[in-house]
């Protein structure tokens, strides 16, 4: 699942105050933790972790749901939340840099894998010289798609381009593949385009297709992906007992099984 840095809205401070209203009391004991999550499917997964935490570790998990442009990093940094679960490392690094915060990743959760899909081929070896591959055009996902193509040995990227390479960083393209950049939401539609052999699509836009990343993809990210989602907290809180117990609860068989169902196979455990 992809989250990019959102723009600040004028009412953000007021809305945040309302959202966290009644949550001003700090809970520093080992038996309570307040965790920010994104409303919807991700909160459904966190509810399972909450149940595991109570039953196995006697830990009371208080979930605070977020949506729209309001994300959990600011209240985590300010101490209103103990931790959050919603982002991958590249997002956290970008957010820390932009805001001057020092939040840290303490555990992996799931990879919501980007993958290549096709209605014309079944495996990478069937790609022909000059075939067209459609990829997202926003910087984070464009870079992610190019790194996936490199993992499949279809292209080579210039060294030291990090997680945000662009098409100009391609230094080898043995099959002379044509890279077509477009808005992520449009990618599922080009699967039926006669000119496009493969479309690289994030799970964000899969719901309309009925595709399953593990079952239906030609190639896919694995759990070693740098885009694995993470549990995040403050530096001084990373070894706290409540954080450790929450990590164990989230990285449990019960949560993995629930995520498999909730995301229809679109969540790969990253631990």
Where do the PLM segments sit?
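A conserved helix-loop-strand patch within extracytoplasmic ligand-binding domains
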Residues: 106-156, 256
